[in-house]
Regions:
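C-terminal hydrophobic helical "lid"/dimerization subdomain
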Residues: 2-11, 237, 283-334
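A short N-terminal beta-strand-loop micro-motif at the entrance of redox/enzyme domains
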Residues: 2-6, 20-48
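Short amphipathic alpha-helix with an adjacent loop that forms part of the alpha/beta core around
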Residues: 210-220
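NAD(P)H dinucleotide-binding glycine-rich loop of Rossmann-like/cofactor-binding domains
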Residues: 72-84, 102-163
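Glycine-rich beta-strand-centered segment in the early N-terminal region that forms part
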Residues: 34-50, 64-109
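Short, well-ordered loop/turn sites that connect or cap secondary structure elements
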Residues: 96-97, 154, 243
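Mid-domain Rossmann-like dinucleotide-binding core that forms the NAD(H)/NADP(H) cofactor-binding site
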Residues: 135-207
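Glycine-rich phosphate-binding loop and adjacent beta-alpha segment
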Residues: 202, 232-295, 334
Length: 334
């Protein structure tokens, strides 16, 4: 790893590129410098990345909406699809980030799987230096969860259901319980019986969401249902069907389709509220995530269950695609 001479002159750095479905290729690309930076951007030296569920369609070869996703068999974009990153600032045009700072946040170009990453400084924040990079990278999804829950009614004393208990769903369960939820129900066909309680889940439902809804008693419907699956249209409808009268549905899962069929009759007759949206105010919520993790020191070590080196990217993504009960968050480190 490190700088090498480019055949055409100059230095090169490593990057990964999806060249076919389920297939990464390591490539050498020209070194990036401060001259690559626009206003409020920073240049990071890669320290760690986290694999998000939203990265997996790209790994499988699905065509995304990014302008550069023009490959014949896969995206063929340097660094794609990683957006959860930890890095050391090596050049900056953002007044809040200086050379040598270690920061966590978003690779704004979804190109974080490379040695040098150019990204928007407004999506980065410093983190507790006691954290290792593989644990610090989990602050990014935690920030997303904290921001999303800010958009909902108070969780205190409420019954919350989280559809999907993959890494982001388990984070929702944990934070909901920490914020005072009376009961947290976690729904997933993966067996989370061994770890659900550790993440605040009171009732672990090992079933698909349609099966869960079909057996849900009218008196036990949650006031808030969080859809944390995404990438297909069915589970949002199940979340709406499951929600108690006057309740709220949060659609957090990333949509792969433009249009989702939902029952407006159920929405209307049950006085439901449907919320969705992306994470804004990113530097603030990254700082909030750092503080939340400080108050809950057991969280990040329990959450990041598997760590791979940058020479093991293929294996890391293959594990992320497998429904494995003991696997939660996967980090990739330098």
């Amino acid at each position: 790893m490190g700088l090498e001479q480019h055949p055409g002159g100059g230095l090169t750095v490593w990057a990964y590129r999806l060249v076919a479905p389920y297939t990464f290729e390591r490539v050498d690309i020209p070194e990036k410098t401060s001259e690559c930076l626009g206003d409020r951007q920073v240049l990071l030296h890669f320290l760690a990345a986290g694999i998000c569920g939203s990265d997996l369609p790209g790994f499988r070869g699905a065509k995304g909406r990014l302008a550069g996703d023009t490959g014949l068999s896969a995206a063929e974009m340097d660094g794609f699809p990683i957006h959860e990153v930890v890095g050391e600032v090596i050049a900056s045009r953002h007044r809040s980030h200086g050379v040598g700072d270690r920061v966590v946040g978003w690779a704004s170009g979804f190109d974080g799987l490379m040695e040098y990453v150019v990204t928007d400084g407004d999506g980065l924040a410093p983190y507790d230096p006691a954290l290792t990079p593989q644990h610090a990278v989990a602050l990014q999804p935690l920030a997303c969860v904290l921001y999303a829950l800010e958009q909902l009614p108070s969780l205190k004393g409420s019954h919350i259901a989280v559809v999907g208990q993959e890494p982001i769903g388990l984070l929702f369960s944990y934070v909901a319980k920490a914020f005072g939820a009376r009961q947290v129900t976690g729904v997933d066909p993966i067996d989370r019986g061994g770890i659900g309680e550790e993440f605040g889940v009171d009732t672990i439902v090992r079933a698909t969401s349609d099966r869960w809804v079909s057996h849900l008693d009218a008196s036990d419907r949650p006031e808030i249902v969080i859809e944390a699956v995404g990438h297909q249209v069915a589970t949002l409808g199940h979340a709406i069907e499951a929600t108690a009268f006057g309740g709220t549905v949060l659609y957090f899962g990333v949509p792969d389709d433009d249009s989702y069929p939902i029952s407006m009759r159920t929405m209307l007759r049950n006085n439901l509220t449907l919320k969705s949206g992306v994470t804004l105010d990113r530097r603030r919520v990254l700082r909030a995530a750092n503080e939340f993790a400080r108050k809950h020191p057991e969280l990040l070590t329990a959450y990041v269950t598997h760590t791979f080196g940058v020479d093991e990217v293929q294996a890391a993504f293959e594990l992320a695609c497998r429904p494995t009960p003991e696997r939660i968050k996967i980090a990739i480190v330098e």
